[in-house]
Structure formats: structure tokens, C-alpha cells
């Protein structure tokens, strides 16, 4: 079920909230929790019921392993078993085809590559539960009930595409009985943020995607301006799409009196690649830092080890996003940029902020081309067209995408908006239920509903 669908907005969400707070108002807190677990599982199964059993099996397995680890007897063995099973599960569904293709290409074999449908949200709920097992090994978990653990993994705002949540932040909120009672301030903030996110997805991201897809589909026929329009367009599309989902997830959490972690903090305002990764997909960055980079040694064993750990971490982030060499290259590119950024800081030379911003934004945009491209040939051809300065003058007949001139200027205008407008999450810190917010919410909601004639997936559903 999509957040940007009529059945979610007008059926699922009102029913879930009404029954949840009904049981809360009657002080039937166990009933309220059970209802939220069941409705979240239904939310997951509505998309494809075939993988509900897989989700439940994963939850049961990780909960049992977590309890075994908490007993402190042979906890290292149980941790290894738990992490190995999680990695194998994710590897089977996400990377089997990719690895078999590499074997066929390298060994000259002709193995039949099976068509394996990627279960929705598997990367997210696998990372969430793996972090839980590691925290149990560190002695940071406290024997939560199975129902509470189920809610932690399945609560519907975050289940499909994050943000990645952590037990120490979320489970105390689930156990707080006051959160089962309706809070009208949270409900108002949640509705406002949900409307803004819905607007960003339907009105901005989905409209940008039309001409971005057309440009990438005609990658071998692009001129200078079209190539730049495609690169800029996808840079904006991905941000508006993914940040919209994250903001809608946070908004839904607010309606349930839950504070989900912020995933974006105006990343395209970053003045360095280091700064960018502190602002982009923040919960993934936290996960990689806490459960991969630091355990590998972090920056504790000299500069070379620090650079190596950074690069390996970014390669894994790339592979986590998708089973393809373009994703690995994208991760490696960011790893290299981070290494350069850290070494530049050691020189003590400070560049003017406009130059820092321009270098950062251009590097990120260039890397996104590999992230979006289906293969290296497509990515390299688009980049070649971007730097084919002999083709700057374009005849109108050569434009492959409808209204390209308008789209280029729209992209530039969007860039200005991204630079100067505050993050919606930051804006909500000053939220007051007044006519201004009522107007923003109503206008954003009405425009979004008017344009919501087709349902489009969020880009991060594929990861």
C-alpha cells in the first residue's frame, strides 16, 4: 500500500488511527498495541501477501536469537548465527542474480539465472534487526516482549523504506501508555507534514520523473542541454521523492505520537561531501558508522586505516542500494570523495563557501548519474554529452523531451528553492496551529489529491 494512494489516505489511515486511539481511550493498551501490529502486517501484505510469511519468520528468528544473546551464554556464537542468516537472506533475494551473472561472465558458464522478486523493505527490516542483535550483544537491550519487538520491526510508517529505526529510541515510546491517547497537536503537525510530503512526491518528484525518464531512455541521442537537464532533474527527483517519503513517515509517526528519526537535513546545502553525508539518508549513515565503520576500527588505527574503513563502508552502502556495478561504483566514488575531503581538511586551506557548495553539489550530481543509469555505457554517454561544448547551440527540432527549455529553467529554480528554503522538519519546530499552517496544509493536500490520478512507487522501494 502506498502513502500516496486514495485507499491509504481515506481508508487505511483513518481506520487504523480511530481503532488505535479507541482502545487507548478505554485504557486497553495491549489491545491498542496488538491492533497496531496487525494493521502494520496488513499494510505490508497488501502490496504482496507472498512475503508476509518471510517477514514474520525473520521477526521470530531474530527475536529468538536476540533473547539467546541476552542470556550471555555463547552470545558471540548466537550473534554470528543471527547476522549470518540475515546476510544470507538479504543476499539470496537481492544479490543471487547479480552474482550468477558475474560467474557466467567470468567463468564462461551458462547458468540459468532465476527470477527472484525482491521482498518489499527487506533491506530496511534486515538492517533494523541486525542492529538489534548487535545491541543485544553489547548488553543494550532489556528483554522486550515479543509483541513489542514485532511492533518495533513492523510499525507501518517506517516498514517499507525507512527511516531505519533503533530500539533504544523507539521501544520506550511504544511502552509509553500516554502515546495510545490522541494528541491533537501531534495530529495537526503530522497532517501538515504529511501534506507537504505528499505535495513533494506527487506534484514535484513525479512530474520531474516524466522528463528525466525520457532523457535517460534516449541517452545516446542527447545534446548538451538535455544531458544537463537529465542530471539536474534526477538529482532533484531523487531528493524530492525520498525526502517526501521520509517526511510522510515521520508525519504518520507523529499522528501515532511517535518520534521517528529525521532522515534529511537539506543535503544539497552541504558545503562538503562530509557535510553531505551528515545530511543525506542520515539513519543509514548512523547505521554504517555504528555497526560497520567503528567496528572495523574507525579512525583509531592511523590515517591509512581510517581511509580504508571509509572507502569500504561506502562500497557497502553502494552495494546495499542495489545489485549492480553502477551502485558499487557510486559508493566507491563517494568513498574516494570522502577520502579527498578528509585529506584536504588536513591542509588547513579554506575555500570560499560558494566554491565549496558548487564543488560538492557538482560531485554529488555527477555520482547520481551512475546511481540512476542502467549500465556504465549509459552513464558515460550522458556525462560525455554534458561536456560536449561544441553542441551548446541546439536547434529546436533536436530536442528529444517535450518542453525541455522550461524543464531546464524549472530545474534551476528548484535548485534555488533547495538552497534557500528551510527543511520542513526544521519549519515544524516553530509549528503553531494557525491559519497560515491550515492554509499550507489544505492547499498542498488539495493540489496533491487533484493530481493523484495514478499511483507511482517511491524510488527507494526498489532498495
What are these regions (language model features)?
Residues 417:
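Substrate/cofactor-recognition hotspot
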Amino acid at each position: 500500500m502506498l502513502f500516496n494512494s486514495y485507499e491509504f489516505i481515506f481508508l487505511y489511515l483513518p481506520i487504523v488511527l480511530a481503532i488505535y486511539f479507541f482502545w487507548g481511550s478505554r485504557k486497553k493498551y495491549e489491545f491498542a498495541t496488538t491492533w497496531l501490529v496487525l494493521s502494520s502486517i496488513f499494510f505490508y501484505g497488501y502490496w504482496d501477501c507472498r512475503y508476509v510469511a518471510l517477514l514474520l519468520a525473520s521477526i521470530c528468528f531474530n527475536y529468538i536469537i536476540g533473547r539467546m544473546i541476552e542470556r550471555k551464554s555463547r552470545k558471540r556464537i548466537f550473534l554470528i548465527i543471527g547476522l549470518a542468516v540475515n546476510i544470507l537472506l538479504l543476499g539470496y533475494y537481492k544479490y543471487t542474480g547479480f552474482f550468477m551473472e558475474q560467474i557466467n561472465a567470468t567463468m564462461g558458464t551458462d547458468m540459468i539465472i532465476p527470477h527472484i522478486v525482491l521482498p518489499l523493505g527487506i533491506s530496511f527490516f534486515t538492517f533494523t534487526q541486525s542492529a538489534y542483535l548487535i545491541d543485544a550483544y553489547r548488553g543494550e537491550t532489556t528483554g522486550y516482549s515479543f509483541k513489542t519487538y514485532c511492533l518495533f520491526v513492523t510499525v507501518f510508517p517506517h516498514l517499507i523504506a525507512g527511516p531505519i529505526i533503533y530500539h533504544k529510541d523507539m521501544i520506550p515510546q511504544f511502552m509509553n501508555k500516554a502515546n495510545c491517547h490522541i494528541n491533537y497537536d501531534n495530529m495537526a503537525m503530522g497532517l501538515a507534514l504529511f501534506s507537504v510530503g505528499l505535495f513533494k512526491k506527487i506534484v514535484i518528484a513525479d512530474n520531474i520523473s516524466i522528463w528525466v525518464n525520457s532523457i535517460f531512455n534516449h541517452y545516446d541521442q542527447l545534446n548538451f542541454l538535455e544531458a544537463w537537464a537529465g542530471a539536474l532533474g534526477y538529482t532533484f527527483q531523487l531528493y524530492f521523492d525520498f525526502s517526501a517519503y521520509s517526511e510522510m513517515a515521520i508525519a504518520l509517526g507523529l499522528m501515532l505520537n511517535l518520534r521517528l528519526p529525521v532522515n534529511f537535513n537539506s543535503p544539497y546545502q552541504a558545503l562538503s561531501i562530509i557535510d553531505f553525508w551528515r545530511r543525506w539518508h542520515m539513519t543509514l549513515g548512523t547505521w554504517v558508522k555504528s555497526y560497520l565503520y567503528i567496528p572495523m576500527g574507525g579512525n583509531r588505527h592511523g590515517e591509512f586505516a581510517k581511509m580504508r574503513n571509509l572507502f569500504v563502508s561506502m562500497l557497502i552502502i553502494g552495494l546495499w542500494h542495489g545489485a549492480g556495478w553502477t551502485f558499487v561504483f557510486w559508493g566507491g566514488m563517494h568513498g574516494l570523495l570522502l577520502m579527498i575531503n578528509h585529506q584536504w581538511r588536513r591542509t588547513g586551506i579554506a575555500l570560499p563557501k560558494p566554491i565549496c557548495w558548487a564543488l560538492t553539489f557538482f560531485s554529488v550530481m555527477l555520482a547520481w548519474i551512475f546511481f540512476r543509469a542502467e549500465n556504465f555505457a549509459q552513464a558515460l554517454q550522458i556525462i560525455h554529452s554534458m561536456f560536449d561544448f561544441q553542441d551548446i547551440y541546439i536547434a529546436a527540432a533536436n530536442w528529444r523531451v517535450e518542453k525541455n527549455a522550461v524543464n531546464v529553467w524549472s530545474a534551476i529554480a528548484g535548485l534555488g528553492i533547495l538552497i534557500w528554503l528551510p527543511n520542513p522538519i526544521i519549519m515544524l519546530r516553530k509549528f503553531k496551529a494557525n491559519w497560515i499552517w491550515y492554509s499550507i496544509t489544505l492547499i498542498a493536500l488539495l493540489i496533491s489529491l487533484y493530481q493523484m490520478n495514478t499511483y507511482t512507487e517511491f524510488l527507494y522501494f526498489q532498495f
